[in-house]
């Protein structure tokens, strides 16, 4: 089998999210505000950034505690039009207010950028 050489029209991106120790140290008011802000920040990624969300996964039932590195707590797999859109989506964590803080106090995001896998996807 020969590897495909064509370049896709979009970037395949895995956004990986990890909760910080501050999330676990926060009181109920801050946790509830963070959860609300997170939902609002990441709604309508298609309309705002042209991203097609292919799926998401939350592994918080088996991953307990802060996520300083791999494995992360949650993931979004998306086709994103370009690197600028990937950066803008990551910046949501930096820019979104949570009471007197920003999301990045409670959650971190990392993006892995590639292309669609050529095997095992059908």
List each language-model region with its residue ranges:
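Conserved, mostly hydrophobic/aromatic
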Residues: 76
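Conserved catalytic core of two-metal-ion nucleotidyltransferases
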Residues: 105-116
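Short, conserved catalytic or adaptor-binding loops enriched in Gly and charged residues
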Residues: 44-45, 102-106
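Short S/T/G/P-rich N-terminal loop/turn motif that feeds into the first structured element of a domain
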Residues: 1-72, 80-84, 114-122
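Short amphipathic alpha-helices within nucleic acid-binding modules
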Residues: 83-91
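A common structural junction motif
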Residues: 93-104
